[in-house]
């Protein structure tokens, strides 16, 4: 991941922040795809790190593993990005607090972004944008229950009127 993800400094970041919480370029990279195509049909790599402008190591900060998977998926125009975690996907509410919460098996990118940004911890909000821009689906799956359907996030999900999910963040009110 470090050799493939190039950190981008933001103008307002101090030197310390340029190493500890970076963003990366994620526009499709045919040269990178060609370089990696000679290997296995599936890319499995560590997440969370990138290469800084001076060649050193930079980290992607909170949610960096999800985000690096999304960056690589977008760069490579992958068929999908899989996020394996401790729950089977995104739910209509926090299943640890609401026993009747429903697994949301299909969401569009905007719905997933809203749910992730307002408190769902299963997926970091930053990882959705690169996949949405590249039209790469995100699959969320459960490491303990791989047979479960999980959640698919893509541009083909039907958006229906009404409430899909309820989420919360302490100290924040969104109206």
What are these regions (language model features)?
Residues 123-126, 137-146, 166:
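Flexible, glycine/charged-enriched surface loops at secondary-structure junctions
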Residues 131:
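Acidic-aromatic/histidine active-site loop/patch
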Residues 149-175:
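A conserved regulatory-domain signal marking ACT and ACT-like small-molecule sensing domains
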Residues 42-43, 58, 138, 151, ...:
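A broad, low-specificity signal marking well-ordered, structured residues that form hydrophobic/aromatic
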Residues 64-67, 142-145, 160:
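Short, charged low-complexity intrinsically disordered segments located at boundaries
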Residues 1-6, 91, 140-157:
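Terminal amphipathic helices with adjacent charged low-complexity linkers/tails
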Residues 1-128:
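Nucleotide/pyrophosphate-binding catalytic subdomain
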């Amino acid at each position: 991941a470090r050799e493939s993800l190039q950190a981008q400094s933001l103008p307002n970041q101090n030197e310390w922040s340029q190493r500890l919480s970076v963003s990366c370029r994620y526009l499709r990279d045919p040269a990178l795809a060609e370089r990696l195509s000679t290997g296995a049909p599936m890319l499995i790599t560590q997440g969370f790190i990138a290469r800084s402008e001076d060649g050193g190591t930079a980290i992607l900060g909170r949610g960096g593993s999800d985000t690096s998977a999304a960056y690589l998926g977008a760069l490579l125009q992958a068929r999908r990005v899989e996020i394996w975690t401790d729950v089977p996907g995104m739910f209509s509410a926090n299943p640890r607090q609401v026993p009747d919460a429903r697994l949301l098996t299909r969401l569009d990118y905007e719905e997933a972004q809203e749910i992730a940004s307002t408190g769902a911890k299963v997926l970091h909000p930053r990882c959705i944008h690169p996949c949405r821009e590249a039209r790469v689906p995100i699959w969320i799956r459960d490491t303990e229950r791989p047979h479960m359907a999980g959640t698919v996030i893509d541009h083909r999900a039907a958006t229906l009127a009404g409430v899909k999910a309820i989420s919360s963040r302490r100290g924040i009110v969104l109206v």
